[in-house]
Design a protein with these regions (language model features):
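Short amphipathic alpha-helical interaction segments
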Residues: 134-149
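A short acidic, leucine-rich amphipathic alpha-helix
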Residues: 127-131
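Sensor-1/coupling segment of RecA-like P-loop NTPase cores
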Residues: 4-28, 147
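Short glycine-/polar-rich loops that comprise or flank the Walker A/P-loop
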Residues: 8-10, 31-35, 241-242
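A cross-kingdom feature that marks ATP-driven nucleic-acid transaction machinery
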Residues: 145-152, 157-258
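AAA+ ATPase "lid" subdomain C-terminal helix
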Residues: 5, 72-78, 138, 151-154
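Conserved AAA+/SF3 P-loop NTPase catalytic/coupling segment centered on the Walker-B
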Residues: 1
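Interdomain motor-coupling "hinge/lid" segment immediately C-terminal to the ATP-binding subdomain
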Residues: 17-125
Protein backbone atom coordinates (compact mmCIF):
# COMPACT_ATOMS: atom_id res chain seq x y z
CA UNK A 1 0.00 0.00 0.00
CA UNK A 2 2.82 2.43 0.88
CA UNK A 3 4.57 1.77 -2.43
CA UNK A 4 1.40 2.36 -4.44
CA UNK A 5 0.57 5.51 -2.50
CA UNK A 6 4.02 7.09 -2.58
CA UNK A 7 5.46 6.20 -6.00
CA UNK A 8 3.75 7.49 -9.11
CA UNK A 9 3.10 5.34 -12.18
CA UNK A 10 4.24 2.11 -10.56
CA UNK A 11 2.70 -1.31 -10.96
CA UNK A 12 3.15 -3.91 -8.25
CA UNK A 13 2.61 -7.59 -9.04
CA UNK A 14 1.89 -9.77 -6.00
CA UNK A 15 1.64 -13.48 -6.72
CA UNK A 16 1.21 -16.62 -4.69
CA UNK A 17 -0.08 -20.17 -4.89
CA UNK A 18 -2.92 -19.34 -2.50
CA UNK A 19 -5.46 -16.65 -3.28
CA UNK A 20 -6.76 -17.10 0.25
CA UNK A 21 -3.43 -16.28 1.90
CA UNK A 22 -2.54 -13.56 -0.59
CA UNK A 23 -5.83 -11.71 -0.19
CA UNK A 24 -5.64 -11.91 3.58
CA UNK A 25 -2.23 -10.22 3.54
CA UNK A 26 -2.53 -7.76 0.66
CA UNK A 27 -6.11 -7.56 -0.51
CA UNK A 28 -7.91 -5.30 1.95
CA UNK A 29 -5.46 -2.35 1.90
CA UNK A 30 -5.63 -2.28 -1.91
CA UNK A 31 -9.39 -2.33 -2.38
CA UNK A 32 -10.21 -0.19 -5.42
CA UNK A 33 -6.60 -0.04 -6.56
CA UNK A 34 -5.93 -3.62 -7.59
CA UNK A 35 -6.96 -6.09 -10.28
CA UNK A 36 -7.19 -9.79 -9.48
CA UNK A 37 -6.04 -12.40 -12.00
CA UNK A 38 -6.60 -16.13 -11.56
CA UNK A 39 -3.63 -18.07 -12.91
CA UNK A 40 -4.65 -21.69 -13.39
CA UNK A 41 -2.49 -24.53 -14.74
CA UNK A 42 -1.90 -24.12 -18.47
CA UNK A 43 -4.96 -24.37 -20.69
CA UNK A 44 -4.71 -26.21 -23.98
CA UNK A 45 -5.31 -22.89 -25.73
CA UNK A 46 -2.11 -21.55 -24.14
CA UNK A 47 -0.12 -24.65 -25.07
CA UNK A 48 -1.47 -24.91 -28.64
CA UNK A 49 0.93 -22.37 -30.27
CA UNK A 50 3.89 -24.49 -29.13
CA UNK A 51 2.82 -27.76 -30.77
CA UNK A 52 1.32 -29.10 -33.98
CA UNK A 53 -2.14 -30.67 -34.19
CA UNK A 54 -0.49 -34.09 -34.36
CA UNK A 55 1.55 -33.34 -31.23
CA UNK A 56 -1.59 -32.20 -29.43
CA UNK A 57 -3.21 -35.56 -30.17
CA UNK A 58 -0.07 -37.41 -29.11
CA UNK A 59 0.16 -35.41 -25.87
CA UNK A 60 -3.49 -35.83 -24.90
CA UNK A 61 -2.87 -38.95 -22.82
CA UNK A 62 -0.13 -37.13 -20.91
CA UNK A 63 -2.49 -34.22 -20.19
CA UNK A 64 -5.17 -36.59 -18.88
CA UNK A 65 -2.72 -38.42 -16.63
CA UNK A 66 -0.12 -35.81 -15.63
CA UNK A 67 -2.08 -32.61 -16.08
CA UNK A 68 -0.93 -29.19 -17.22
CA UNK A 69 1.13 -27.58 -14.50
CA UNK A 70 3.82 -25.53 -16.29
CA UNK A 71 6.68 -27.59 -14.88
CA UNK A 72 4.93 -30.85 -15.74
CA UNK A 73 4.37 -29.78 -19.35
CA UNK A 74 8.07 -29.00 -19.81
CA UNK A 75 9.54 -32.06 -18.06
CA UNK A 76 10.88 -34.60 -20.53
CA UNK A 77 9.96 -37.93 -18.93
CA UNK A 78 6.96 -39.54 -17.26
CA UNK A 79 9.13 -40.45 -14.27
CA UNK A 80 10.08 -36.81 -13.66
CA UNK A 81 6.48 -35.69 -14.10
CA UNK A 82 5.38 -38.29 -11.54
CA UNK A 83 8.04 -37.23 -9.02
CA UNK A 84 7.15 -33.56 -9.41
CA UNK A 85 3.43 -34.16 -8.83
CA UNK A 86 4.10 -36.33 -5.80
CA UNK A 87 6.27 -33.56 -4.37
CA UNK A 88 3.47 -31.01 -4.86
CA UNK A 89 0.90 -33.21 -3.13
CA UNK A 90 3.25 -34.13 -0.30
CA UNK A 91 4.85 -30.76 0.36
CA UNK A 92 2.16 -28.28 -0.68
CA UNK A 93 -1.26 -29.82 -0.26
CA UNK A 94 -0.67 -31.47 3.08
CA UNK A 95 1.58 -28.83 4.66
CA UNK A 96 1.19 -25.34 3.23
CA UNK A 97 -2.60 -25.53 2.90
CA UNK A 98 -3.05 -26.66 6.49
CA UNK A 99 -0.75 -23.89 7.69
CA UNK A 100 -2.79 -21.22 5.90
CA UNK A 101 -5.79 -21.63 8.19
CA UNK A 102 -4.13 -23.19 11.21
CA UNK A 103 -5.58 -26.64 10.51
CA UNK A 104 -3.87 -29.62 12.12
CA UNK A 105 -5.44 -32.83 10.85
CA UNK A 106 -3.57 -33.54 7.63
CA UNK A 107 -4.82 -37.14 7.64
CA UNK A 108 -8.45 -36.07 7.42
CA UNK A 109 -7.65 -33.57 4.68
CA UNK A 110 -5.90 -36.27 2.67
CA UNK A 111 -8.78 -38.71 3.21
CA UNK A 112 -11.26 -36.08 2.02
CA UNK A 113 -9.22 -35.37 -1.11
CA UNK A 114 -8.95 -39.08 -1.90
CA UNK A 115 -12.69 -39.53 -1.46
CA UNK A 116 -13.41 -36.61 -3.80
CA UNK A 117 -10.85 -37.98 -6.28
CA UNK A 118 -12.48 -41.41 -6.35
CA UNK A 119 -15.95 -39.89 -6.75
CA UNK A 120 -14.90 -37.54 -9.52
CA UNK A 121 -17.98 -36.14 -11.24
CA UNK A 122 -20.44 -37.89 -8.91
CA UNK A 123 -23.01 -36.04 -6.84
CA UNK A 124 -22.01 -35.86 -3.19
CA UNK A 125 -23.27 -33.84 -0.23
CA UNK A 126 -21.34 -32.51 2.75
CA UNK A 127 -23.40 -34.80 5.00
CA UNK A 128 -22.53 -37.86 2.92
CA UNK A 129 -18.82 -37.03 2.87
CA UNK A 130 -18.85 -36.38 6.61
CA UNK A 131 -20.44 -39.73 7.38
CA UNK A 132 -17.92 -41.60 5.25
CA UNK A 133 -14.99 -39.83 6.91
CA UNK A 134 -16.27 -39.56 10.48
CA UNK A 135 -16.26 -35.76 10.25
CA UNK A 136 -18.92 -33.16 10.88
CA UNK A 137 -20.70 -31.55 7.94
CA UNK A 138 -19.28 -28.17 8.97
CA UNK A 139 -15.70 -29.48 9.01
CA UNK A 140 -16.10 -31.03 5.55
CA UNK A 141 -17.53 -27.76 4.25
CA UNK A 142 -14.66 -25.77 5.80
CA UNK A 143 -12.01 -28.05 4.29
CA UNK A 144 -13.57 -28.00 0.83
CA UNK A 145 -13.99 -24.24 0.97
CA UNK A 146 -10.28 -23.91 1.74
CA UNK A 147 -9.32 -26.34 -1.04
CA UNK A 148 -11.44 -24.30 -3.45
CA UNK A 149 -9.76 -21.06 -2.44
CA UNK A 150 -6.31 -22.50 -3.16
CA UNK A 151 -7.46 -23.80 -6.57
CA UNK A 152 -7.19 -27.53 -5.91
CA UNK A 153 -10.86 -28.39 -6.41
CA UNK A 154 -14.04 -26.66 -7.48
CA UNK A 155 -17.72 -27.43 -7.10
CA UNK A 156 -20.46 -27.57 -9.71
CA UNK A 157 -23.93 -27.05 -8.34
CA UNK A 158 -27.10 -28.39 -9.91
CA UNK A 159 -28.78 -26.08 -12.41
CA UNK A 160 -32.09 -24.85 -11.02
CA UNK A 161 -33.97 -21.59 -11.18
CA UNK A 162 -34.72 -21.74 -7.48
CA UNK A 163 -31.57 -20.14 -6.02
CA UNK A 164 -32.11 -21.78 -2.63
CA UNK A 165 -32.06 -25.21 -4.27
CA UNK A 166 -28.91 -24.33 -6.22
CA UNK A 167 -27.08 -23.72 -2.97
CA UNK A 168 -28.43 -26.64 -0.95
CA UNK A 169 -28.52 -29.49 -3.48
CA UNK A 170 -25.71 -32.02 -3.62
CA UNK A 171 -22.91 -30.88 -5.91
CA UNK A 172 -20.18 -32.42 -8.03
CA UNK A 173 -16.50 -31.86 -7.28
CA UNK A 174 -13.69 -31.67 -9.81
CA UNK A 175 -9.95 -30.95 -9.75
CA UNK A 176 -8.40 -28.01 -11.56
CA UNK A 177 -5.62 -30.34 -12.69
CA UNK A 178 -5.79 -34.02 -13.62
CA UNK A 179 -2.21 -34.61 -12.50
CA UNK A 180 -2.95 -33.49 -8.94
CA UNK A 181 -5.98 -35.76 -8.84
CA UNK A 182 -3.97 -38.76 -10.01
CA UNK A 183 -1.15 -38.00 -7.57
CA UNK A 184 -3.63 -37.97 -4.70
CA UNK A 185 -4.83 -41.49 -5.52
CA UNK A 186 -1.35 -42.66 -6.59
CA UNK A 187 -2.41 -43.76 -10.07
CA UNK A 188 -0.33 -42.76 -13.09
CA UNK A 189 -1.18 -45.86 -15.12
CA UNK A 190 -1.68 -45.48 -18.90
CA UNK A 191 -5.22 -44.99 -20.17
CA UNK A 192 -5.30 -48.46 -21.73
CA UNK A 193 -5.47 -50.15 -18.32
CA UNK A 194 -7.54 -47.60 -16.37
CA UNK A 195 -11.18 -47.80 -15.35
CA UNK A 196 -11.60 -44.05 -14.87
CA UNK A 197 -10.83 -42.70 -18.36
CA UNK A 198 -14.32 -41.24 -18.76
CA UNK A 199 -14.01 -39.38 -15.46
CA UNK A 200 -10.55 -38.06 -16.39
CA UNK A 201 -11.86 -36.84 -19.75
CA UNK A 202 -14.83 -35.12 -18.12
CA UNK A 203 -12.63 -33.48 -15.47
CA UNK A 204 -10.15 -32.31 -18.11
CA UNK A 205 -12.73 -30.76 -20.43
CA UNK A 206 -14.76 -29.06 -17.71
CA UNK A 207 -11.55 -27.63 -16.27
CA UNK A 208 -10.61 -26.34 -19.74
CA UNK A 209 -13.93 -24.47 -19.86
CA UNK A 210 -13.32 -23.05 -16.38
CA UNK A 211 -9.82 -21.91 -17.40
CA UNK A 212 -11.19 -20.18 -20.50
CA UNK A 213 -13.70 -18.38 -18.32
CA UNK A 214 -10.89 -17.01 -16.13
CA UNK A 215 -8.40 -16.30 -18.91
CA UNK A 216 -10.86 -14.57 -21.23
CA UNK A 217 -12.99 -12.86 -18.59
CA UNK A 218 -16.21 -14.43 -19.87
CA UNK A 219 -18.14 -14.06 -16.61
CA UNK A 220 -19.98 -17.38 -16.96
CA UNK A 221 -21.53 -19.50 -14.23
CA UNK A 222 -21.18 -23.29 -14.38
CA UNK A 223 -23.56 -26.06 -13.35
CA UNK A 224 -24.55 -29.63 -14.13
CA UNK A 225 -28.15 -30.61 -14.92
CA UNK A 226 -30.10 -33.70 -13.91
CA UNK A 227 -33.77 -34.69 -14.07
CA UNK A 228 -35.66 -36.79 -11.52
CA UNK A 229 -35.45 -39.80 -13.86
CA UNK A 230 -31.62 -39.50 -13.86
CA UNK A 231 -31.19 -37.93 -17.31
CA UNK A 232 -28.11 -35.75 -17.08
CA UNK A 233 -25.98 -33.13 -18.83
CA UNK A 234 -22.38 -32.80 -17.68
CA UNK A 235 -22.02 -29.03 -17.96
CA UNK A 236 -24.37 -26.07 -18.25
CA UNK A 237 -22.77 -22.69 -18.94
CA UNK A 238 -24.84 -19.63 -18.17
CA UNK A 239 -23.96 -16.12 -19.29
CA UNK A 240 -26.03 -12.95 -19.40
CA UNK A 241 -26.87 -13.71 -23.03
CA UNK A 242 -27.09 -17.48 -23.38
CA UNK A 243 -27.37 -20.92 -21.85
CA UNK A 244 -25.11 -23.67 -23.27
CA UNK A 245 -25.28 -27.40 -22.53
CA UNK A 246 -22.27 -29.68 -23.02
CA UNK A 247 -21.94 -33.45 -22.69
CA UNK A 248 -18.52 -35.15 -22.63
CA UNK A 249 -17.96 -38.76 -23.70
CA UNK A 250 -14.73 -40.69 -24.20
CA UNK A 251 -15.07 -42.84 -27.31
CA UNK A 252 -17.15 -42.93 -30.47
CA UNK A 253 -20.40 -44.34 -29.08
CA UNK A 254 -23.45 -42.26 -29.97
CA UNK A 255 -25.61 -41.11 -27.06
CA UNK A 256 -29.13 -39.77 -26.85
CA UNK A 257 -29.60 -36.14 -25.85
CA UNK A 258 -31.64 -35.91 -22.60
Amino acid sequence: KLIVDEIEDIRVIASGSSSFDLLNKAGEPLVGRSTLFHLTPFSQKEIAPTETTLETRQNLESRLIYGSYPEVVTLDSFERKTDYLRDIVGAYLLKDILAIDGLKNSGKMKDLLRLIAFQLGSEVSYDELGKQLGMSKNTVEKYLDLLSKVFVVYRLGAYARNLRKEVTKAGKWYFYDNGIRNAIIGNFNPLSIRQDVGALWENYLISERIKANYNEGLGKEFYFWRTYDRQEIDLVEESSESLTALEFKWGNKKTNVP
